[in-house]
From Swiss-Prot:
Phosphoserine modified-residue sites: S99, S104
Function comment: Plays a role in pre-mRNA splicing by facilitating excision of a subset of introns. Plays a role during early embryonic development. Involved in the dorsal-ventral embryonic patterning. Probably acts as a negative regulator of the NF-kappa-B (Rel) signaling pathway.
Disordered: annotated segments: 1-156, 449-492, 512-541
Protein name per UniProt: Splicing factor Cactin
Biased segments, Basic and acidic residues type: 16-67, 113-156, 512-521
Annotated Pfam families: Cactin_mid, CactinC_cactus
Cellular localisation: Nucleus; Cytoplasm
Database matches in InterPro entries: Cactin_C, Cactin_central
Amino acid sequence: MPKEKSKHRHRSRSRERRDHRSPDPRSSRNRDRDREREREKDRDHRDHRDKERDQRREREKDKSRDKKREHKSRRRRSSSSSSSPSSSTSSSVPGAPRSPLVKSPMKLLQTLEARRLVEQKDRQRKKEELKAHETPEEKRARRLREKQAKEQRRRERMGWDNEYQTYSNEDNPFGDSNLTSTFHWGKKLEVEGLSNLSTKTVEVLSLQKQLENRRELEKVKKRRQERELERQVREDDLMMQQRAKEAVQFREWQRQEDQFHLEQARLRSEIRIRDGRAKPIDLLAQYVAAGNEPLEECLEMQMHEPYVLLNGLPVEELEDLLVDIKVYEELEQGKHIDFWNDMITIVQDELQRQQKLEAENSSLNQRRDGIHQAVVKDVADIFRGKNAQQLEEMRHRIEAKISGRADGVDISYWESLLSQLKAHMARARLRDRHQALLREKLSLLKRENDNETLQEKVAPQVKEEEMETQDAEDPEVEEGSPEDEEDPLNELRKTVRLYQAGNYSPRYIREEDFTGRRAQNEDVDEPEAEGLLYEEEDDERRTQRQRLLILHPERVDNNQLTPQELRMRNEAKQGMQGDEAEFSVETTLDAVPQLATDKYRPRKPRYFNRVHTGFEWNKYNQTHYDMDNPPPKIVQGYKFNIFYPDLMDKSQTPQYFLTPCADNGDFAVLRFHTGPPYEDIAFKIVNREWEFSYKRGFRCQFHNNIFQLWFHFKRYRYRR
C-alpha cells in the first residue's frame, strides 16, 4: 500500500512538472483543475484513513476495557468469598476502612461508562442497519447531507459569515465557479516572497487576513455607530435649544398678548368714561392708574375711597364686577395685586350681604347665622374706627380662639366674625392707601401753586428789565432829539409798553379794523388774525372750528414726531451711504372714503425715504467724461421706509402699487396701501425696470411696524 501511494505521488509530480513547462493558458487551467481534484481525492483518502484508524483504536480500547472489567469482576468474587470468615476480625478493628463507601464512586463511573458504550453500540448498530436497508436514492441524499455538513464546518473554520453560508460554486451572485476554494494569487505571492508556501499555509494566511479585515470592518462599523450617536446627541441638543428658544418666544408672545388685552381693556374703559356710560370696573381701573397720571386728570375721582362705588349696585352688577376684577388681576400679572385682592374681598362681602337680604325677604333662609341680628350693629361698632394694624391683631386673636376650641366657645359666631373682619381689613387697607394718595396729590398741588405764585412775582420784574434793556440799546431815545419828541409813533410805542407792563389793558386794535372789514387773506395764521374783527358769519365758523378742536384734539395736525416714530426714523437712517439722499417727492391722491367703523382718525403715515444715485459709465460717458469731470448722476434705486406704528390689524400686510404717469411715461406713481387708520400715500419715481434679486439689494418686508421697500434699477449693457 505505501509503495502504491509513493508511485502515485511520483506520477502526479512529474505530471505537474510537464504541465508547468507548457505555456498554453488553457492547459494551465486544466492542470490547476486536475491538481485540485487530486488534492480533494488525497484529502478524502486521508480522512477515510484517519477514520479507520480511530475506529480501530476505539475497538482496541473497548476490548481492553472489557478485559479489565472481567478481571475486576473475578477479583471481586474472590474477595467476597474470602471476606466472610474475616468479617468478625475486620469489624473488631476500629481504624479499618469500609470498602463499599470507598468503591461506590468508582462503581458509578464504571456504570455510566458501560451505559455510554452500550448506547454508542446501539446507535452504531442502528446506523449500520439503516445503511444496509437504505435505497440508492436515500444513500445519495445521506452522502449529500454529510458532504454539506462537512462543507459547513470547513466554511466555519475559514471564517465565513452567515450571509455567505448559502453560496456555492454553482449558485452565487458573483458568477465564481471556484468560490469555495481558496484563491491562489501567484504573482502577489511571488512579489511577497511566499511562492514556496504550501496550499494549507496560504489558506491559513488568507484566513488571518480575512479575520483582520473583519475586525477592521467591525471597528469602522463601531466608529460609524458612535458618529451617528454623537450626531443624534447634537440633534437632540439643538432640538432642546430650539424648544427652549420657542418657549421663551411663546412666553414673550403671551406677555405681549396679555399686554394688548390690558391696553384694550383700558381703552374701552376710557371710551366708556368719555361717553358718560362708565362701569364700576372702569372707575376702579382709572383709580389704580391715577398714581402715574397728572394731577388734573383724576382729581375728582380720588376724592372718595374706591369701595364707595359699590354702594347701590345690584347683585348682577356685583357679579359682573367680580369677574372683571379677576380679569384685570390676571392681565396685570401681579401689578396692584393687593388692591385687586382687597376689592375682591369687599365685593364678595357685599354680594353675600345682598344675597342674604334677598333670601330673608323671600323667607328662604331658615339656617341660623353665627351672629344674631340684634348684635350685628354692635359688631360693626367694634370694627369701626380701627386701622389695618389693629384689625390684624384682632384677627390673630380670633384665629387663636377658633383653633383652641375651648369649652363654651361658639365657633360659628367667631367664624362669622372672622369673615366680616376680612372685609373690614380690606376696607381699612384701601382707606389708608387712599389717604396716602391724597396726601401725595396735596403736596403736588401745593408745589404747583408755589411755582405759579413765584412766576407771577418774577414776570413783572423780567418785563421791566427787558424794557430798560431796550431803552438802553436805543440811542435815539436816550438823546431825546426834538424830532423824536415830535414823532407820534414814539409816543404810541411808549403807551404800548405801559399797557404791557400793567398786564391788564386789552390788545391794541387798529382804527381801520373797527369798520368790521374782513381779513382778505384767509390763510393768515391764528396769532396774526387774533386782533381782527369778524362778521357774524366768520365768527360762527371760527367758533365751530374751535369747538371741533376741543372735542377732537387728535385731529390737529402735529408735525412733531413721537418718541416711537423718532426711534423708527433713526432705525431707518442706519446704513445710509454717501451716494444716497433723503427722498420725499410725495404726490397727491384722490380722497379714499374711510369706513365708518374706524377707531382712529384717518391720517397719512410717516416715512423716511432714500434715493440712490450714481454715475453710469457707458461708452458715451467714458468718451466725454472722466473722474475729474464726471457725468451727471442718475437715479439707480430707492429705499422706502413707511412707518405704521398704530396699525389696527397687524396681520394685514401693507401693499404697494406701481402706476405709470399718464402725461409722462418716464415717471411712475408708487402708491402704498394699508388698513385703517392710515391713508394711502404715493411718491413719484423714475419709471424703469426693477431688479428683484435679493443679491442686488431688493427688500420688501414689514417688520417692527416699518414697511421697507428697497430696490435698484436694472442696468442694460450693450453686447454685440
